[in-house]
Amino acid sequence: MKLLAMAVLLLTICSLEGALVRRQAEELSLQRLVSQYFQTVTDYGKDLVEKAKGPELQAQAKAYFEKTQEQLTPLVKKAGTDLINFLNNFMDLKTQPATQ
């Protein structure tokens, strides 16, 4: 009976040790994966900064903003004019009943 209890105890301890070793191995692989992920993100960020420093990208951005401004300026002016006309019509409607 004691021999059976010792065998069960030994098997339990060995299986727990094995699980602990596997868990530690999984943690190491997870740490390695996270480390590789951060390294990749860092490398990508450095490449992006180097590309952004180039005059080509800055020229493209400047051209994009100028084109956008050229297209939006007339729309904004028209919207402002329409808003003023709408408010004037609204004010005229309010003043007409008072004069009658």
Swiss-Prot record:
Q: Name one GO biological process term.
A: cholesterol homeostasis
Sorted alphabetically, which Gene3D superfamilies does this protein's record hold?
A: 6.10.250.100
List the signal peptide residues: 1-18
What's this protein's family per the entry? Belongs to the apolipoprotein A2 family.
Where does it reside?
Secreted
Matches recorded under InterPro entries: ApoA-II, ApoA-II_sf
Question: What is the name attached to this protein's record?
Answer: Apolipoprotein A-II
User: GO: which molecular function terms?
Assistant: cholesterol transfer activity; high-density lipoprotein particle binding; lipid binding
Protein task = May stabilize HDL (high density lipoprotein) structure by its association with lipids, and affect the HDL metabolism.
Q: How does it assemble?
A: Monomer. Interacts with NAXE and NDRG1.
Show the GO cellular component annotation of the record.
spherical high-density lipoprotein particle
Q: Which UniProt keywords apply?
A: Cleavage on pair of basic residues, HDL, Lipid transport, Secreted, Signal, Transport
